Amino acid sequence: MIAAAFRRWKHARRFARASAEIMARDIAPRPHGLAAPLVVSLTSYPARFPNLHLVLRSLLAQTLRPDRVILWLTRDDAARLPDSARLPGLEIAICPDWRSYKKIVPTLLEVPDANIV
C-alpha cells in the first residue's frame, strides 16, 4: 500500500516536471532541409486526451520543423477533443476508425511522396 502510494507520488512528480519543461520550451525550430515534405502523423483516443496537449506541444517544439503535423481522429473522437489539444500549427483531420492504421494510411493517401514520421 505504501509502495503503491509512493509510486503514484513519484509518477505525479515526474509528470509535473516533464510538463513544466515542455511548456517552457521556446518554439523556434529550423527548417528540415529534406527534398520532400516532412509530415508528422499521429492519432489518439479519448482516454489519452488529458495528456495529449503535452505530446502535441512537444512535437511542435522539436528542433526541426515539419511541414505538417496531422492528428487523425474519428468524427466521434474529434468532437470530444479538448481545447487544450487544439494548438497552432496542428492539423486535425477526420478519418474512418482504422485503429492504429489511422495514423499512417490517411497520410499515405493524402501525401504519398512525403517523408512521414
Label every PLM stretch briefly.
Residues 48-49, 100:
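Alpha-helix N-cap/loop-to-helix initiation residues
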Residues 55-67, 85:
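Short, acidic, metal-binding catalytic loop of nucleotide-sugar glycosyltransferases
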Residues 32-35, 63, 109-112:
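Flexible, charged surface loops at secondary-structure boundaries
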Residues 1-30, 35:
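Membrane-proximal basic amphipathic "stem/tether" segments
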Residues 72-115:
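Active-site-proximal specificity loops/subdomain of glycosyltransferases
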